[in-house]
Amino acid sequence: MDRSFIRNFAIIAHIDHGKSTLSDRLLELTGSLTAREMQAQVLDAMDLERERGITIKAHSVRMMYKAHDDVVYQLNLIDTPGHVDFSYEVSRSLASCEGALLVVDASQGVEAQTLANAYLAINNGLEIIPVINKIDLPSADVERAKEMIEGAVGLDASHALPISAKTGMGVEDILESIVHLVPPPKGNPDHPLQALIFDSWFDSYRGVVILARIKEGTVRKGDKIMLWSNKHQFLVEEMGVLTPKPVAIEQLEAGEVGFIVANIKTVADVGIGDTITHVERPCLEALPGFEELKPMVFAGIYTVDAHEHTLLREALEKLRLNDSSFFFEPESSVALGFGFRCGFLGLLHMEIIQERLEREYDLDLITTAPGVRYKITLTDNSVIEVDNPSKWPDSTLIEKIEEPIITAMILTNEEYVGGILKLVEEKRGRQKNFEYVTGSRVMLTYELPLNEIVLDFYDRLKSVSRGYASLDYHLAGAWESPMVKLDIMVAGESVDALSTIVHKDFAYDRGRALVSKMRELIPRQMFEVPIQAAIGAKIIARETVAAMRKNVLAKCYGGDISRKRKLLEKQKEGKKRMKRIGKVDIPQEAFLAVLKVGENS
């Protein structure tokens, strides 16, 4: 097909602003699916995506649209994940397009994630078409939404398209705007092959399926291709386009988007953002912007039932087939048995993986408190990276500790600013910027330690702003912090699963909160059980679970005091001996409760 009739575009929207519904309408209008095949949110194939109303993986769909000028155009919609954990995937999806629809909810206006992705699109030089959705709602305010697009994003919104994706009103105008405003792709089918991978998934029959946008050149069935980053070579076995059903074709040329199957065994071989080229006639340079995805948040995952350990390993291996950004390694804990130390892109990513393990593989799991990776310079000037409290070096060997930080953009209404400022101060944030986007909407930019965000920041932000704040963040390097390892000891023995890394200034409060919570949860024994919080050898907080005792004086009616004293002394001796040899079983609830302590302390 002539490249001047191809249009590649993405949809940028905040969660719940109607991106997947709009995609459904576009598919319906262009006749890509029959009425029988339509179901809500066609592109969100995972149950979890439908339920949470989020898009996790990027998809692409080819639609043929006969415009009002009687020309048939090929429109490639490249679906993007909208959540902050997957922002790198979004940036690669946007790099595959020439245009983007910026969808804003008429009743809610611009939110933080929309902003972050809109900036990405502007930086990629995309033609942006503002669309105001949900105008059928009684609370819709189109003028305010336009004002916010102009104030926050800096786009001219006077020609913004008012639509309702639910009823289909105004959706045809979007297709016409895409045809007339989005530029056709550049590129020459005769140049050496250069294609951008923007998604991949694992198919149990065909191996890895790659979604790619061909920037230069042509790829055909039977070609030998090479991945630029690792120089691995593969033979193209089949290729095609999604309409959203897969349709096989013989070749893809510059400007087109499609899938390639090339007998690739694992997703780990295929980096999102990598460049595909021919082995015989390679391109001169890779496409810009490729980076290896690194896990940011770490947690231990254990099964409640120790016998399910092998099932957990199999489940993790299957998930890893489809998700190269997720990593795991075996670890064992005295308290919880065998499990895995897992790395995730962020909190949502962690929740999704945990939920998929429980739902698809029917496992009962315990997750330890999430933490981040610290860079520690030791006294002998060597540098190590630690993401697990059990590997934390002795404090006498540490020269300095650096923790990862993020830049957070928070959009909210001005009446909630006070509560939010208090929250970010408490989380050790440093203010970078404070500006009014419109009359009453404020954008705060803060630098915060990632460690403070992983526990409960998002939930608390929602509660102090009554749900009116939205958050977007990206990594911003590291800063030096006095972090310490907080150990919890029960009956004099350290419980490894409860150790956490905390900032020195908060260690005392966190220790107090943990031991008092543990005291409520550990059942009374026949001897007293001390519960202590310690930093190194220094005990900073202590609670005691009192012993249960039998009334040994019950059978003494009156009688001499020395007789009573003798019985009490004898009981005391017995308790002492039990305390020396007694073992305390810590119930499962204690671990789960401790993970929740961070939410209130």
From Swiss-Prot:
Q: Which family does it belong to?
A: Belongs to the TRAFAC class translation factor GTPase superfamily. Classic translation factor GTPase family. LepA subfamily.
Q: What enzyme category does the UniProt record give?
A: hydrolase
User: What protein am I looking at?
Assistant: Elongation factor 4
Q: Which GO terms describe its molecular function?
A: GTP binding; GTPase activity; ribosome binding; translation elongation factor activity
Q: Which GO terms describe its cellular component?
A: plasma membrane
Q: Which Gene3D superfamilies match?
A: 3.30.70.240, Elongation factor 4, C-terminal domain (3.30.70.2570), Elongation Factor G (Translational Gtpase), domain 3 (3.30.70.870), P-loop containing nucleotide triphosphate hydrolases (3.40.50.300), Translation factors (2.40.30.10)
What job does this protein perform? Required for accurate and efficient protein synthesis under certain stress conditions. May act as a fidelity factor of the translation reaction, by catalyzing a one-codon backward translocation of tRNAs on improperly translocated ribosomes. Back-translocation proceeds from a post-translocation (POST) complex to a pre-translocation (PRE) complex, thus giving elongation factor G a second chance to translocate the tRNAs correctly. Binds to ribosomes in a GTP-dependent manner.
Enumerate the PANTHER family for this protein: TRANSLATION FACTOR GUF1 HOMOLOG, CHLOROPLASTIC, TRANSLATION FACTOR GUF1-RELATED
Asked if rRNA processing is a keyword of the record, the answer is no
Return one Gene Ontology term, BP aspect. positive regulation of translation
Signal sequence residues = none
